[in-house]
Amino acid sequence: MKNTFGQAVALTIFGESHGPAVGAVLDGLAPGLPVDEDYIRRQLARRRPSTTLDTARQEQDCYQILSGVYQGRTTGSPLTIVIPNENTRSEDYTYGLARPSHADYAAYCKYHGYEDWRGGGHFSGRVTAPLVAAGAILLSALDRVGVTVGTHILRCGGAWDRPFAPDAAADVAALQTAEFPTLTCEAAQAVSAEILQARERQDSVGGITQTAVCGLPAGVGEPWFDSVESLLSHAIFSIGGVKGIEFGGGFSAVSGYGSDFNDAFRMERGRVVTATNRNGGINGGITNGMDVVFQCAVKPTPSIGQPQQTVDFLRGEDAELTIHGRHDPAIIRRICPVLDSVAALVLCDLLTQRFGTDYLAKEARA
């Protein structure tokens, strides 16, 4: 089981849903980066369930930084964050009954029954909590070099938000203080209604998120196997529930011609820009200086309250299952800060590879 991502800046995650704690280790950080613990708490609060739209499992996420920080700044050694699990209810789960669209059976096949299956174990969304805590440190580092990241709900069920503006910086800034991750109040109300309707039916609903990265310099990334798209996709598909990703215009490119999809170059205030951004800020796997924009398909939460057909893989028998645990009718609201954090990991890694370890700390030390 490999749980580390990144080369110059690497993140390792550990822990299980109903174990003592979950946590993360960040390695390769430059020394001297300020660690804003208030911002870490705000990011964790964005991920934490807080309304009738979310799971009833309430965790306080009282994290502890065990290493890598001294007097409020990174030391350059591995930074370890641990978050205790304080509200578990393992009796809601029955080992051997494979929950449809969950990892129960696949994990049993891979780990030969030695996996911690309670609450989904290491496959649980609970493990995204330390990912978000670590991501907050990375997002702060990016912000100091002028790079910002934001994610909103573009679609949930039949409810739609507007897409990011062509220059997404103002929209991304607004998302940092938004109570709900949409760009319009109307979309927030419509998305909430879709989620509540799914909950009332003992069902769940999925959707589409849209993420924008603003302020990246041109020339970051590699062709072929370590392209910006390749690395973002690799990392983002590690998030449970993500089933698809597209950059810029993505699949809409198939319905037009090159003359429709090409992004024309022009000069603007001494800078090379494109008139449109259908390629999502990436050409040949390398950033071109425009906003990097991508959409993710998020499946409906597989845990629903309706009876479902399954198998008891220990007995080799067909079975029926009704899930009684505490689960989200939709994870699309809570997945937004997770996407920001994973994108920040990839970008910090790429920027450090391109410009060196001290690049992200140069403004902090000035």
Where do the protein language model's features map onto the residues?
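Generic N-terminal targeting/processing segments that precede catalytic cores or assembly contacts
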Residues: 1-366
